[in-house]
Amino acid sequence: MHVLVVHNRYASAQPSGENKVVDQEVALLREAGHRVGLFERRSDDIAGRSLPGKAAVALLVPWNPAVRAELAARLRAERPDVVHVHNVFPLLSPAVLAACADAGVPAVATLHNYTQVCPPGTLQRDGRPCTECVGAVPLPAVRHGCYRGSRPATVPLAVSLAVNRRRWWSGVERFFCISAAQRDVLVRAGMPAGRLAVKHNFVPDPDVRRSGDGEQLLFLGRLAEAKGVRLLMAAWDELAAGGGVGVPLVIAGAGPLEGEVTAWAAGRDDVRYVGLYNAAECRRAVARSVAVVAPSTWLEAFGLVVVEAMAAGVPAVAAGHGAFAELVEDGVTGLLHRPGEAASLASCLRRITADPALGRELGRAARRRYEQGFSPAVGLERLVDGYRTAIAGRSAQARGGESRVGRGDGDSR
């Protein structure tokens, strides 16, 4: 099969689960003998642009005509069987869907977050769940400055969502939802249920697994409010006030709360902030852990770090909402705490560190869960099945003499 992957890579200065998923899927497909091409833009390149060039980026977020022309020309030249769209913000735009329609190539799209119904994609505002923009014109997001706390920065995203919603919903043959929890939200928002398929992200089998009880608790991810970083700090201070749990907390990552985390960890024996790990360091750190901590306050659409822990035979202590409640079976493959409650998180951390036998049992069950649902073999099967469904759907339309463009769902700009 010939696949063209379309992705706007996130900035390399901060960890990106999406970049990792894209790279892993491309490698998996190639190893299985499929031909895979890439059509990419990199957010890192924005920094090197002139001031007018940087200002122009926001104007092209809703629609980039140059990208449409470039991608359509490549599709006509290479004739892939299917296009797999990931992130299109900020340099690609939904114009990639028009390019697919122009060239008559079916498109599938992985929905890594909630940007189809929420401009910043988090379904969260001020640390609490928010669905004001779901199924509506996203004016509340602009009013509250939901993207990076800025109204001007939110406007391009809100405009893109409003003007391109129909284009997304009609121009993609198959949407890959990365959890059933995410799919439920999107169906309630009005997205076409028949084209929303659950396809969990897979994780490569790590080269190192936990062999003992673990020597630390690990937070691995973006240092941001939505990831529960402040909640974790509050829970850890509560534990420290009671004498601690006997193992240190290791925090690895980067993000807007980095300065706050650095100051909080300074001079403490029970906390280590280690900065941004590379991939190999991440795997080794996970394998040394009693548990991986994932206390997100927003409704995670998936939770890659939880599955990476499962692969290493390490349980997770995670917030009991969103995809985490789907990935982690409480008391079987890990522990779930009440979302947003520091005391509940502290209780779970205390429990898993106080009972090594429980930790070992949860870790073994987590590894079995990984093998059954998140291995590369399972991931490849689901990915290729999704492609075949999309190709068959487009072929059926062609045989029936009907296409989305012919029904007026395409774009003529």
Model-derived segments and their meaning:
Residues 287-301, 314:
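Acidic donor-binding loop of glycosyltransferase active sites
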